[in-house]
Curated annotation (Swiss-Prot):
It comes from the Eukaryota. The modification Phosphoserine is found at residue 71. Its EC number is 3.1.4.-, 3.1.4.38. The keyword Metal-binding applies. The gene is ENPP6. This is Glycerophosphocholine cholinephosphodiesterase ENPP6.
Length: 440
């Protein structure tokens, strides 16, 4: 009798410990700057790779990013399920007055400090702590020790990954799954964002970048079959934000026309969202002067709209400037972020940007998924970037940490048992194993 009961308890322990998808692998793609309408039904007709993925899996109408609709804030929102004011990665550029340290879009040495990253635990850290093997390719932050943890493998981002780099990363990730070296692989690709910035979201260059990604994804579905992974691997594709047109010729707000820049202790970023720290005694003067400027809004920290889920962030500045869509804030025109174009000089004008109000249509991103745990040919209602984390946790079979995402917005895309409840608490498994031990 004890043996039979022990066997039943063992089955219970294993069943509770692992949802239906727990032994399956997950391949994640973060395609930077990928606006939702880039894969409209009309556009899909000339994108066979994406079209196949949509027919085999899930496509949401659009994904609303967190505010600000910039890269680093949403990189972390996607991987933690938390708003920026919770995970603390509130911008591409940040400053901490206490330490006088800066985070400058991840390129300066101080950007690697735990100060910026330890505000929340991203999924890859949780999985690594759970003895899962995580492979990351060009993913911003994978080179950082977060809460004392690094992923199993990190191919560090140093320059914009080429199309060949992207294809090689996909192939290597699939080989890692087949050999058992990886449980999660995460691949970051930036070219669509870069071309959208340089030439504009509707440009031939941006469309060519998308076609290059489409070609790799078309091969990927074939490679999955060739490696026999089709029943063991789920694939999720998402973006951090969209892109809109900007017009430097007539839509630039130059701060030096309204205030003295010497009255600022610090200023961070240029574009749709700019952070200002007035010098002592200058706060009211700067606020009053900037309040009259057209095509932007200046917020004192406490007055930032609650819907942005931003103002409680510990790195948020005393004054935050938010531009109207298409407008660009800078100190002066000489400080605009030109790029090195075909002339070989840094004088190229940017034609696209992001970071604006996250509810604007052009800021919307994408979410696609396919694999054994996802419904086929399923169109889902819009979701938000905070929701993606719960989907990933479910399909890898790990309990999500407390987060701001909504399970009700995403459960419809999962099929069978995977779509009924989030992963179970590990305490249930522990209880069953303890009972089994006592009966042994």
């Amino acid at each position: 009798m004890a043996v039979k009961l022990g066997t039943l308890l063992l089955a219970l322990a294993l069943g509770l410990a692992q949802p239906a998808s727990a032994r399956r692998k997950l391949l994640v793609f973060l395609l930077d700057g990928f606006r939702s309408d880039y894969i409209s039904d009309e556009a899909l007709e000339s994108l066979p790779g994406f079209k196949e993925i949509v027919s085999r899996g899930v496509k949401v109408d659009y994904l609303t990013p967190d505010f600000p609709s910039l890269s680093y804030p949403n990189y972390y929102t996607l991987m933690t399920g938390r708003h920026c004011e919770v995970h603390q990665m509130i911008g591409n550029y940040m400053w901490d007055p206490t330490t006088n340290k800066s985070f400058d879009i991840g390129v300066n040495k101080d950007s690697l400090m735990p100060l910026w990253w330890n505000g929340s635990e991203p999924l890859w850290v949780t999985l690594t702590k759970a003895k899962r093997k995580v492979y990351m390719y060009y993913w911003p932050g994978c080179e950082v020790e977060i809460l004392g943890v690094r992923p199993t493998y990190c191919l560090e981002y140093k320059n914009v990954p080429t199309d060949i780099n992207f294809a090689n990363a996909v192939s290597d990730a699939l080989d890692s799954f087949k050999s058992g070296r990886a449980d999660l692989a995460a691949i970051y690709h930036e070219r669509i964002d870069v071309e959208g910035h340089h030439y504009g979201p509707a440009s031939p260059q941006r469309k060519d970048a998308l076609k290059a990604v489409d070609t790799v994804l078309k091969y990927m579905t074939k490679w999955i079959q060739e490696r026999g992974l089709q029943d063991r691997l789920n694939v999720i594709i998402f973006s951090d934000h969209g892109m809109t047109d900007i017009f430097w010729m007539d839509k630039v707000i130059e701060l030096n026309k309204y205030i003295s820049l010497n009255d600022l202790q610090q200023a961070k970023d240029r574009g749709p969202v700019v952070s200002l720290w007035p010098a002592p005694g200058k706060h009211s003067e700067i606020y009053n002067k900037l309040s009259t400027v057209e095509h932007m809004t200046v917020y004192e920290k406490e007055a930032i709209p609650s819907r942005f889920y931003y103002k409680k962030g510990k790195f948020v500045s005393p004054l935050t400037l938010v531009a109207d869509e298409g407008w660009f804030i800078t100190e002066n025109r000489e400080m605009l972020p030109f790029w090195m174009n075909s002339t070989g000089r840094g004088n190229g004008w940017q034609r696209g940007w992001h970071g604006y109000d996250n509810e604007l249509m052009d800021m919307r991103g994408i979410f696609l998924a396919f694999g054994p745990d996802f419904k086929s040919n399923f169109r889902a209602a819009p979701i938000r970037s905070v929701d993606v984390y719960n989907v990933m946790c479910n399909v890898v079979g790990i309990t999500p940490l407390p987060n701001n995402g909504s399970w009700s917005r995403v459960m419809c895309m999962l099929k069978g048992r995977a779509g009924t409840t989030p992963p179970v608490q590990p305490s249930h498994c522990a209880l069953a194993l303890i009972l089994l031990f006592l009966l042994a």
